[in-house]
Amino acid sequence: MIKFLAVHPGPLMYTKIYLRLEPIGLELVAQAARQAGHNVRLLDLQVEAQETYFRLVEAWTPDAIGFSCNYLANVPEIIDLAKATKALLPNVFILIGGHSASFVAKELLRHGEGAIDCVLKGEGESAIVRALAAVGEDRKALSSVPGAVSIEGDGPPASFVPDLDEVSPARDLVAHRRKYFIGVLDPCASIEFTRGCPWDCSFCSAWTFYGRSYRMRSTERIIEDLARIREPGIFIVDDVAFIQSKQGFEIGEAIAKRGIKKQYYLETRGDVLLRNKDVFAFWKSLGMHYMFLGVEAIDEEGLAMHRKRISLGKNFEALEAARALGVTVAINLIADPSWDRKRFEVIRQWCLEIPEIVTISVNTPYPGTESWLTESRSLQTRDYRLFDIQHAVLPTTLSLPEFYEELVKTQDVLNRKHLRWSALKSTAKLAAWHLVRGQTNFLSMLWKFRSVYDPNLQLADHYRPVHYELDPPSALQSSGSGLLSIHAARGRRGRALDDATERFVDKTRAGSTP
C-alpha cells in the first residue's frame, strides 16, 4: 500500500473573483488510487496555504505525490513545490498529470532537474493505478504504463478509462467544500455527465486531448453521484452540455423522479441550444438558472478565425432563446491582441446594450491547440505564468500598456453591470441568504475586481524574473490532429453520438479531423 498525496495547485487570476471549482479531476484520480487499496489524501492549494502542504508532507511523509496541472500558468508553482519537496523527502516519488501537463511533459521533466520522476499524459484514473504499482514494486515498470513519460523513457500511448462509471469523485477527501462556488452558486459542487468534445475549434485543446471522442456516463451513476452531493449548486463540467437531447431528457427525468432539488450551471454552444431547445427548457424547470454560451466573437471574421462554424445570426438567435428561457446567461468574448482602441470601444458599447454577463479573455495560443502551431512563432513571451488568457502573449497593435488599459476598461463593463453594489438590488435576497448561511464567496466578488484586474499589475507581470519558459513548437511540426492528440483519434466509433447528432456536428465544425 502506497501513501499517496494528491495536490491541486493554487488559484489563478480569474479564479480569485468569478469562480473557484472543486478539483473534480483530481478527486477522480484520488478515488481510483483509493479503490486500488492505497492510502490517499488530497490537498487543494486553491483554499489551503503552501505552509499547510509542507506541514502535511513532513508529518505524513507520503511515498508518492501527484500534482494536478490543468493550467499552464500553474507550471512554475508546481515545479518549485516539487523541488522543495524533494529537498525535504529525497526518496518521495513525484509525478505530474493533467490536461496541460500532457502537452508539455518533456518540458516539465527538464524544468524539474531531477525533482520530477514522471509525467502522466492523458486520463489519470487508470494510469495512476499502474504508476503507483510501479512505485511500490519496481520503478522500472513505469516504462510499461500508458502515458507515462520519465527521464528513462516513454511508456505506451495514453489510454482511456475503459468505463466512465468505474470511478466517482472522492469528494470526502476535500476539506473545505464550502469554499467552492461559481457566481451566485455558493457553495457549488461539480459533476461530469460526459467527457470529450466532437468539435475542433482552433483555440481549444479539449478535442485534441481526447482525440475528438465523446463518451457518456450512465444515467444511473450520474444520479447516484448527484444524490450524494450536499451543496445546493451544481456546475456541470461537460465541455458542451446536452449535445444529444435523449441523454438530457433521461438524466432530467431521473432527477425529477428522485426529487433532487438543485440549481445548475452549465456550458453549451449556441447551435446546440437552438437544436435542443426543449431539453434546456426542461432543465430550466429542474433548476437550471445559469448558462454559459461560448460566443467568442461578435463578427463573422472573428468566428472564422476561431474556426467556429456558426453564423453570427445563429449566435444572436441563441442569446434570444436563452433569454426566452428566463435563465441568466454569461458569454465570453476573445480579445485579439490586434485590437485597437476603436475595436475595444465597439465591444464595450455592445456589452452595455445586452443583458448578458460578459467576460473578456485574451486570445492565447496553447500547446495542444492548432493556434499554437500557427501563431506561436510570434510569441512575445514564453513565461508560463502569462498563459492564463488574461495576459497578451502575442504582439499587440497598441502598446502593451495601452492594450491592458483598454482590456481592463472593457472588462470593467462586467463590474459595472453585475458586480457593483447597485447591481445587488435585484439579488438582495440572495445575498442576504448567502450571509445567513455564512457563505461569502459570492459577496467577495463585489470588491475584488479592482484589486485583481489592474492594468498596471498586468503590465508588471511581464517584467517579473522568468525561471521557466515554454518551448516553442518544433520547426518540423505542422498543423494536424495526429501531432496534437494525446489520446489517439478513433473516428466515428470513438463518439457515443446518434447518427443525426454526428451529422449535425459535422455540419457545424470547420475542420476535417476524423
Feature-to-residue mapping (PLM):
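Residue-level recognition of beta-strand->loop/alpha-helix junctions
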Residues: 8, 42-46, 208, 294, ...
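Short, electropositive alpha-helical surface patch
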Residues: 60, 251-255, 341-357, 418
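Glycine-rich beta-alpha loop elements in corrinoid/cobalamin-binding modules
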Residues: 2, 19, 25, 32-160, ...
